[in-house]
Amino acid sequence: AEDLCMAVSQSGETADTLAALREARKSGARVMALTNVVGSSMARETEGNVLFTWAGPEIAVASTKAYITQVEMMLLIAVDLGRKRGVLSPQRAQQMLTDLAALPEQAKRVLELAGEAQRFASRHFDRKHVFYIGRGLDWALAMEASLKLKEVSYIFSEAYAAGELKHGTIALIEEGSLVCALLTQRTLAEKTLSNIREVKSRGAHVLVICPEDLCEQARTVADEMWLIPNVPCLLYTSPSPRDPKTS
């Protein structure tokens, strides 16, 4: 079989993911699982083709460490596949691994924003809806952030690809709407800034979350701004505060 199907599930028991895995196997694809639970259905049904995240029990309703370890594991898989296929140089691969190992220290700096986040929540806790926007990798982050807000605060929230705002989404933005804009993709920064200007023109209150090297550009459009450390763009999807040497 030339196709590989990777099933990702914290519990290893997610019914629809299991069904998709079984269907892929029936179709002749090789299957593997990425899960947090040893002895789960996915671990058994992939017959040893399984990678465990070893995140420990997930207690919170909103997935935190399980999600983070899944993203990190998939990044490591991508780096290794890139090296083996010859599309990623050994030097570039090593640099990505070095950057990933340094990420816990960078994440600790982000945790210092806790007080600022609490004050932000105190100002906006009575919002009826919150929108998240971003481009590229930032859209994936926006979807996860929106999910976390819904699960924890029960505030209606949706995430949208910033480039698709004009296709109906912009009509939902009204005076006083809270929009959280993620701006970490440097090559897409100008386009995202243009989208932020669009929502501001409709009266939105905008929080921009961006790295330090984009703060001057973001300052021109943001009502509020949180600065995060400068790291390679791909690593913004993997916000681990853990030390990979000890966990």
Predicted features and spans:
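Extended hydrophobic-aromatic, low-complexity segments
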Residues: 14-18, 119-120, 140-144, 151-152, ...
